Design a protein with these regions (language model features):
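A short, Lys/Arg-rich alpha-helix, primarily the initiator
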Residues: 1-17
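Short alpha-helical DNA-recognition segment
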Residues: 20-39
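DNA major-groove recognition helix of helix-turn-helix/homeodomain DNA-binding modules
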Residues: 48-65
Length: 68
């Protein structure tokens, strides 16, 4: 399960960078704490479907684009 979280986090980070968003701006747009976004991107935490949906809205993509 930990490996899945790391892959998902890496995909979120890659998509965020592709969109040209700094982590702090991304966190602000998603209404999440920047440190929490960092933990997500490093695969240190499992996120809920609700949080994944919020992140996809900010990134302008579908969840399937982020899931490994």
């Amino acid at each position: 399960m930990k490996d899945l979280a790391k892959k998902l986090g890496a995909n979120i980070r890659a998509k965020r960078k592709e969109k040209g968003l700094a982590q702090d701006k991304f966190a602000e747009l998603a209404d999440l704490d920047r440190s929490y976004v960092g933990r997500i991107e490093r695969g240190e935490t499992n996120i809920t479907v609700d949080k994944l949906y919020i992140l996809t809205q900010v990134l302008g993509c579908h969840a399937r684009d982020l899931l490994p």
